[in-house]
Design a protein with these regions (language model features):
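Bacterial lipoprotein signal-peptidase II cleavage site
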Residues: 26-36
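Detector for C-terminal structural segments
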Residues: 27, 229, 327-353, 392-402, ...
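N-terminal lobe/hinge region of extracytoplasmic solute-binding protein
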Residues: 67-123, 216-219
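Alpha-helical secondary-structure segments
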Residues: 68, 144-152, 179-185, 221-222, ...
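Gly/Pro-rich hinge or "lid" segments in bacterial periplasmic/extracellular proteins
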Residues: 88, 197-247, 251, 261, ...
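Aromatic- and charge-enriched surface segment that lines or borders ligand/interaction sites
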Residues: 117-161, 177, 183, 313
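Surface-exposed binding/hinge segments that line
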Residues: 127, 131, 165-207, 227
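Ligand-site clamp/hinge motif
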Residues: 211, 240-285, 411
Length: 542
């Protein structure tokens, strides 16, 4: 494929599924993150880093072939306005079909143009001018011009997409002065706005996708939608007229293997050339076997959200803090994952560019007993319900939490549901829980969006957690900060405010590893554990 000509974006400061639960904090204050003591050959803390691990350029690309990818979950619909855009939920497929206006480069921490030609800020980061490439066409033959981009962005908001509220709260107008220019006016300063165009809003959907009643995935990416067999596979076909030249691969085949262990077996035996893993034990096995891949560490991916709604035990901040200081995450991870993974009670542990010297609340069961005693003196009966799932790892986690909370005086009832869907309904839709296994998921690349959605009082993903004016002000301050140093300073104060608010119990980050076989090359990582495959190719041996 020809070298890509891009206009480089001036560096911008910054780097829902329920998460798998990780482990290990210590009794010392401010645990910054460590690998739990696991089996011989397990990954070390330094292994769990954001970016591409292993592999090489492979030499001259080879044309042709089908890349079979074992997905983590089956996306119900490949529509960025209706599906959360992440590697675990159809992000690879959607990036292949729609491309993205901008791409985050994990090696440099910069946002770069991809489908777009450039993006420039003016008026103190309140105006962003998006320049489009000439001659880019959707797969239906219509042009991807400024009007098409505006239509897709408006559609994204109208359909109430994952980041629609954040977009609507900030973007005041979209104008198209000519076919290749889109001007976005913001209501407030936002230096890291380009990250919004690396995910759902940056996946431009053609008008024809909505024609005829049933949605059809139509974009300007390197591949087109071919076929879909429910619970079996999705097939994408290479485009001859992709703007950056025909991709090397002929097809991408996405297969759905519901059991994570079976998925790894399928991958290691050669039944797939790539696979998405989130279980730390399985990630350790893939790393120990020397498979390359794209690693992402999702901060707050493994938490117990606390319902702070009126009438719930968590409405009392003393109860929230008592639960936090009664939990030792290493116990959870030893029981659930045989000690694999990284553990920390900090918002952003030591692996992160957002890590600061601000410490988290320490494991302190005596302090937990004291706080619980105070709450009981004011009428709290000490009873809480923990919501989890029935699969072995989730059940082990729930039992560990029950044991630790009861050791300081709580009475814990377990509510273990059968599926992720049941858990989402209880937590996100009905808010029918006291404490629940969950993933808040603040991403290393451009964390502001998830910060706003989950912990700002205007956010749409707080699921009943405590929000307040102090945290709102800090999140707003993070948004307008211009340099990474300024942002990191705010993040330290966010950690300190977290210690006061205790919106959730923190067990550690979630590792997400999109691994591929050694003869696969040209895979590019971007945000939300997604990869781009327009330059990917498969060597005949390896």
């Amino acid at each position: 494929m020809k070298p890509r000509t891009t206009t480089r974006l001036r560096p911008v400061a910054g780097l829902f599924l329920v998460a798998a639960l990780v482990a290990a904090c210590s009794s010392s204050p401010g645990n910054t993150g460590s690998a739990a003591a696991g089996p011989r050959g397990a990954a070390t803390p330094s292994t769990y880093q954001v970016g591409v691990i292993g592999g090489g350029d492979g030499g001259e690309p080879v044309k042709g072939g089908t890349l079979t990818f074992g997905a983590y979950a089956e996306a119900a619909v490949l529509d960025p306005a209706r599906t959360i855009v992440a590697g675990s939920t159809g992000g690879l497929e959607m990036a292949a079909i729609y491309d993205v206006l901008m791409r985050w480069d994990s090696a440099t921490g910069e946002v770069r143009p991809q489908l777009a030609k450039g993006l420039e800020a003016s008026d103190g980061y309140t105006t962003w001018t998006l320049t489009l490439r000439d001659g880019v066409m959707f797969s239906d033959g219509t042009p991807l011009d400024a009007k098409a981009v505006k239509w897709s962005l408006d559609r994204y908001v109208e359909k109430g997409a994952d980041e629609a509220r954040l977009w609507k709260d900030n973007v005041t107008s979209i104008t198209t002065p000519d076919d290749s220019t889109v001007v976005l006016k913001l209501g407030r300063k936002w230096p890291t706005f380009p990250y919004m165009l690396t995910t759902g809003p940056g996946m431009i959907v053609a008008r024809s996708a909505d024609e005829g009643g049933a949605f059809k995935p139509v974009g300007a990416g390197a591949f087109t939608f071919g076929s879909y067999a429910e619970h079996e596979e999705t097939v994408l076909n290479a485009r001859e007229d992709y703007w950056d030249g025909r991709p090397n691969l002929d097809k991408i085949r996405i297969i759905y293997v519901t059991d994570p262990n079976a998925l790894l077996d399928t991958f290691t035996s050669g039944g797939a050339q790539a696979a998405f893993l989130r279980d730390p034990q399985l990630i350790d096995k893939a790393l120990a076997a020397g498979f390359p891949g794209y690693m992402n560490m999702v901060a707050l991916g493994n938490v117990g959200v606390i319902n702070a709604s009126e009438g719930r035990p968590g409405a009392d901040p003393r109860v929230r803090q008592a639960m936090f200081q009664a939990i030792k995450p290493e116990v959870i991870y030893q029981r659930s994952y045989n000690g694999a993974g990284v553990a920390s009670t900090q918002v952003f542990p030591s692996f992160s560019r957002w890590h600061t010297d601000a410490t988290s609340l320490p494991y302190d069961p005596d302090k937990a007993r004291e706080l619980l005693k105070q709450a009981k003196a004011d009428g709290f009966d000490g009873k809480v319900t923990y919501l989890g799932r029935q699969d072995p790892a989730a059940r082990a986690t729930a039992l560990a939490i029950k044991s630790m909370l009861e050791s300081v005086g709580f009475q814990v009832e377990l509510d273990l549901v059968r599926s992720v869907a049941d858990q989402i309904t209880k937590v996100s839709v009905n808010k029918d829980y006291d404490v629940a296994g969950w993933g808040i998921s603040w991403r290393e690349a451009g964390p502001y969006g998830r910060m706003f959605a989950t912990l700002h009082s205007k956010g749409n993903l707080s699921v009943g957690m405590h929000t307040g004016p102090e945290m709102d002000a800090l999140i707003d301050e993070f948004q307008v900060a211009e340099t990474e140093g300024e942002q990191r300073a705010v993040m330290g104060r966010i950690q300190e405010q977290w210690n006061k608010d205790v919106p959730a119990l923190v067990y550690g980050p979630t590792p997400e590893f999109l691994t591929w076989r050694k003869n696969v090359h040209g895979v590019e990582g971007t945000v939300n554990s997604m990869v781009l495959l327009d330059d990917a190719w498969i060597a005949p041996t390896g």
